[in-house]
A protein has these predicted regions:
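A cross-family phosphate/adenosyl-ligand binding-site feature
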Residues: 36-133, 168-173, 178-225
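Active-site/ligand-binding-proximal alpha/beta "capping" segment
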Residues: 125-162
Length: 226
């Protein structure tokens, strides 16, 4: 099995630090920099995983985004990990923007009113909206829909198609963070390593691996301060 440190070595942007500060410390740091608040898109599914650890991490992420003064953007459903993440953010008084295609029925939309609900026609339009209106992206452990969203961001970063919220070109791309709980994304990272080794991928495309909710903000805070 490939260990965590090997991925941290391969992806230059990844941190190899083993120690993670406590959530309170990171949130305090976030609160001191409210002028640097972000729109953070969370990619996750409308299903609940078998692992309660993943579901609890989704709730922690929603709370952390709200407490940091950031805005949560997500796929608009009240089901599964989408509901866990957005519900936790709403309970903390956070701003939550749901982006949902019109072909989904109304009964999957959040029962607690979100701050803003954006209706789009297709899944492609949802991804386009999230990429255009977000400063950073976090993927919880997820299925093929989540992987599709991750790869969409990576392709946009690699091709230089990403723009900031003002519409200006953002040549350095936007951070795409994988929450790699328990090594969930290790096989995916290994495949990307092979792709890059074969010369079929030019860069890390903004990909960052984090190992806890605390680690996400440890890695995002220096980026937003810049």
């Amino acid at each position: 099995m490939i260990k965590r440190c090997e991925y941290d070595t391969f992806w230059p942007i990844l941190s190899s630090a083993d120690s993670t500060p406590k959530t309170a410390a990171i949130l305090a740091d976030s609160n001191e920099n409210r002028n640097n608040t972000m729109n953070i898109s969370v990619f996750c599914g409308a299903s609940l995983p078998h692992s309660e650890q993943i579901t609890e991490a989704a709730r922690q992420l929603g709370r952390a985004i709200a407490r940091g003064g950031h805005t949560l953007l997500y796929g608009g459903s009240n089901l599964g990990l989408m509901g866990a993440t957005s519900g936790a953010a709403l309970q903390e008084g956070g701003r939550v923007v749901g982006v949902i295609p019109t072909f989904f029925s109304d009964d999957i939309i959040h029962s607690q009113p979100v701050s803003e609900l954006v209706r789009v026609r297709t899944l492609a339009e949802r991804k386009e909206y999230l990429i255009a209106h977000s400063d950073a992206f976090v993927a919880l452990p997820g299925g093929i829909g989540t992987l599709d969203e991750v790869l969409e961001v990576m392709v946009a970063n690699q091709l230089g198609l990403v723009r900031d919220r003002s519409g200006a070109n953002q040549s350095q791309g936007k951070p795409m963070i994988l929450l790699n709980l328990g090594g969930y994304y290790n096989p995916f990272l290994e495949q990307l390593r092979l792709v890059k080794e074969e010369g079929l991928m030019r860069s890390d495309a903004g990909l960052i691996s984090a190992y806890s909710v605390e680690d996400i903000f440890l890695k995002l805070n220096p980026i937003v301060k810049d």
